[in-house]
Swiss-Prot record:
Domain of life: Bacteria
Natural source organism: Synechococcus elongatus (strain ATCC 33912 / PCC 7942 / FACHB-805)
Homology family: Belongs to the SfsA family.
Designated name of the protein: Sugar fermentation stimulation protein homolog
GO terms assigned for molecular function: DNA binding
Pfam families, A to Z: SfsA, SfsA_N
Transmembrane segment boundaries: none
Signal sequence coordinates: none
Length: 236
């Protein structure tokens, strides 16, 4: 059964006119007003940033913000009409709720959910779960697909490669988990994006062989909120 882990504030609907300079998106609201919204996603948004598609934005009451609106969702129609999460600030918040509510039985028993714990080569792990054998959890957001196959990454990521090396190295003293946040509900499996970054895919496979745990988590995204659906199969 889907489990609601995040509820959006009231959102406004519109259509995407353009995205530019990575951080900006011009959107025509249903009211007819054209606004410039903050785009909280610095990546290429491969296959997702489709001009003219329906979007939802949130509005901040903070008078100090340069842009009052934040682009939250876009609808794509690759498989069927599907809402895709745009705000990359949300996945870690949702995963924190997922971990605190013990939604992943495969992780077993653990104590405290710690955030941004230093480890590796001047890095910070997204989450550290305390226990006799601590669990280090790194979260990666993905919206790129090929059919119903979710893929990560969609571009070369030296930072992501570094994280995989560090997670593999820490297996000597702890469990290590790579959690992929599939930020759309139309995918049924996950695979590394070898065509975008073959080195990342190689490092992921090396890590798995050494004991790295990989959990591609499926989520249903809607203008109402984000629901956890379960763990998708991994294709290597």
């Amino acid at each position: 059964m889907p489990q609601r882990l995040y509820t959006y504030p009231p959102l406004l609907r519109g259509r995407l006119l353009q995205r530019y300079k990575r951080f900006f998106a011009d959107i025509e609201l249903d009211s007819g007003e054209t606004i410039t919204a903050h785009c909280p996603n610095t990546g290429p948004m491969t296959g997702v940033c489709q001009m003219g598609n329906l979007v939802y934005v949130s509005k901040s009451d903070n008078p100090k913000r340069k842009l009052a609106y934040t682009w939250e969702l876009i609808e794509v129609t690759d498989n069927e009409p599907t809402w895709v999460g745009v705000n990359t600030g949300l996945p870690n918040r949702v995963v924190q709720a997922l971990l605190e509510q013990r939604c992943l039985p495969v992780l077993g028993d653990y104590g405290e959910v710690q955030r941004e714990v230093p480890y590796g080569e001047n890095s910070r792990i997204d989450f550290r779960l305390t226990g006799d054998r601590p669990i280090y959890v790194e979260v990666k957001n993905t919206t790129w697909t090929a059919g119903r196959l979710a893929l990560f990454p969609d571009t070369v990521t030296t930072r992501g490669q570094k994280h995989l090396r560090e997670l593999t190295a820490i297996l000597l003293e702890a469990r290590a988990v790579m959690l992929y946040f599939i930020n759309r509900g139309d995918c049924t499996a996950f695979a590394p994006g070898d065509s975008a970054d073959p080195t990342y895919g190689q490092l992921l496979r090396t890590g798995i062989a050494a004991g790295l745990e990989v959990y591609p988590c499926q989520f249903q995204i809607s203008p109402e909120g984000i629901d956890f659906l379960g763990v998708a199969p991994l294709q290597l």
